[in-house]
Amino acid sequence: AYEMCGRDWSSDVCSSDLAMTLMVQAGHDPRQPHGRDLPDIEHLNADLKGKRIGWLGDWGGALPMEVGILETCEEALKVFDDLGCTVEKVAPPFQLELLWDSWITLRSWSIATSCAALFLDERTRDLLKPEAQWETERGLKLSAMDVHRASVIRSRWFEAAAKLFDSYDVLVLPTAQVWPFPVEWTWPKEIAGMTMDTYHRWMEVVVPAGLIGLPCLAVPAGFGAAGLPIGLQLIGRRGSDVALLRMGQGWHEAAPWAHLRPEVT
């Protein structure tokens, strides 16, 4: 309930399933500072005509992407055109490296609060994988001012994003910067020739929504040349969960996907 960065997620396969999950989980609770009641979402109205979609792409080149991801996502965005939405490219609304610095600071701080006891005890340290040890050690070295600076950036981004939602109902990013990679890899070491400086830099595309806890819905965009899948993040303003579910429902009705299978061997 008190995490600085959004990390809660659900793996429901469609908007209607997610709506049922939220009807069970969500709602006001005096023990939870951010809980709120939801309207009836059992029947989702999927009429999206007139909705404004902002496409952030690769954040003006700041996010390295493997070949084909942007093209597949941009082709998928045409579904919104068919639904009567307006899709526009959006210039980078904030310096991405600042968002990354804020996110990794708050994440390391959060991980350290959870794993410090294991890390500081030499008898249990090796129970943590190397990446967790690195992040815990990093978090333990942070000062109060480091966390404060990260929190200020987080607040500035929240304000900038809120202003952006005055022009757009939903912002869109790819769900990933890489196609699904071999199971033997722990994580991708480079993307499009750019070396990843941390074990989670390859997931930077999810930071803009996660850093400030915006509701985000992933929908399938399609398959690339190798038959591997990619999706779209549909990101809404704070409190727009129901509107985002309706957006996802409209997408699924216009672009049914459950019967599709990639041509892979």
Pin down the residues of each PLM region.
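Short helix-loop capping/hinge segments that flank enzyme active sites or metal/cofactor-binding pockets
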Residues: D47-G57, T105-A162, P174, V178, ...
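Acyltransferase
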Residues: M65-P92, C115-R123, V147-Y168
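Short, exposed "boundary/linker" segments that immediately precede the start
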Residues: A1-G6
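A short helix-breaking turn/cap at a secondary-structure junction
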Residues: R7-E71, E75, F94, A254-T265
